[in-house]
UniProtKB/Swiss-Prot annotation:
Name of the protein in its database record: Nascent polypeptide-associated complex protein
CDD domains per UniProt: UBA_AeNAC
Species assigned in the record: Methanocaldococcus jannaschii (strain ATCC 43067 / DSM 2661 / JAL-1 / JCM 10045 / NBRC 100440) (Methanococcus jannaschii)
Task of the protein: Contacts the emerging nascent chain on the ribosome.
Gene3D superfamilies: DNA helicase RuvA subunit, C-terminal domain, Nascent polypeptide-associated complex domain
Protein keywords: Protein transport, RNA-binding, Transport
Listed PROSITE patterns: NAC_AB
Domain of life per record: Archaea
Gene (UniProt): nac
Length: 128
């Protein structure tokens, strides 16, 4: 709670005084803290986190060294592979009267969005 070395008796006295003034502190068992900015993220692995309650207003203190990650890398990590089910493929193929291969390709291009895949195939039909 307090930086440097503090005499244990003095620490108890300080904590009592803080409590008398309506201030309470608590160490939190936190494994990771992430700050998300527009262009980067700061990831604190195993930080020391304390919450201080002063007359009902909570203030959080985070101590540790952040790992800074640029946003391009973060977005790549968040990219998720969409699962396309056989039922979705059959539905799109039947609705648009196309082969399952064409339906699957359209679903993949539309990230699994059935309605968007159907509209895409219908537009392609109109163009031909």
């Amino acid at each position: 709670m307090f930086p440097g070395k503090v005499n244990p008796r003095m620490l108890k006295k300080m904590q009592k005084m803080m409590k008398d003034f309506g201030m309470e502190t608590e160490d939190l068992d936190v494994r990771k803290v992430i700050f998300v900015f527009d262009d980067e993220e700061w990831v604190f692995e195993e930080p020391k986190v304390q919450v201080m309650d002063i007359l009902g207003v909570k203030t959080y203190s985070i101590t540790g060294k952040p790992k800074k990650i640029k946003k391009e890398k973060v977005e790549e990590e968040e990219e998720v592979k969409v699962e396309i089910t056989e039922e979705d493929v059959e539905l799109v193929a039947k609705q648009c009267n196309v082969s399952k291969e064409e339906a699957r390709k359209a679903l993949e291009e539309c990230n699994g969005d059935i309605a968007e895949a159907i509209l895409k195939l219908e537009e392609e039909k109109e163009e031909n």
